[in-house]
A protein has these predicted regions:
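Non-transmembrane "mature" sequence context
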Residues: 1-113
Length: 113
């Protein structure tokens, strides 16, 4: 993936998800310095980090259909009963995105709107 494409994806996550740079790093289980190096082309994400980055971008896109950026950020960092009290951010950071994706599918179907 090119530097400009990677930067665009990270910017999209930050913009649509209302997520700060350090939170992007937290969600991807890396450091803010590493994310900065990805954005400037000084480094490339490992496959696992790239997969999480792409999933996080997809999630931010989906949440933007329902929420403003500040609301999406709140959704990501708040405990949810439908996730057994877990925060989506914690599940993303540990690679357990399947549960979140199922919840997003339910939101899209109108089950919890």
């Amino acid at each position: 993936m090119t530097t400009s494409a990677l930067k665009k994806r990270i910017d999209n996550i930050r913009e649509k998800g209302g997520i700060k740079s350090r939170e992007v790093a937290q969600l991807l289980d890396t450091t803010p310095q590493t994310v900065s190096r990805w954005q400037t082309g000084q480094a490339s994400p490992q496959p696992k980090s790239l997969e999480r980055l792409l999933t996080l971008e997809w999630l931010a896109d989906q949440l933007s259909q329902f929420y403003e950026p500040d609301e999406a950020r709140l959704w990501l960092f708040s405990p949810h009963a439908l996730l057994s009290g877990s925060r989506p951010a914690d599940l993303i950071a540990t690679g357990r995105t399947d549960e979140i994706l199922r919840l997003i599918d339910q939101l899209q179907s109108g089950a919890y709107t």
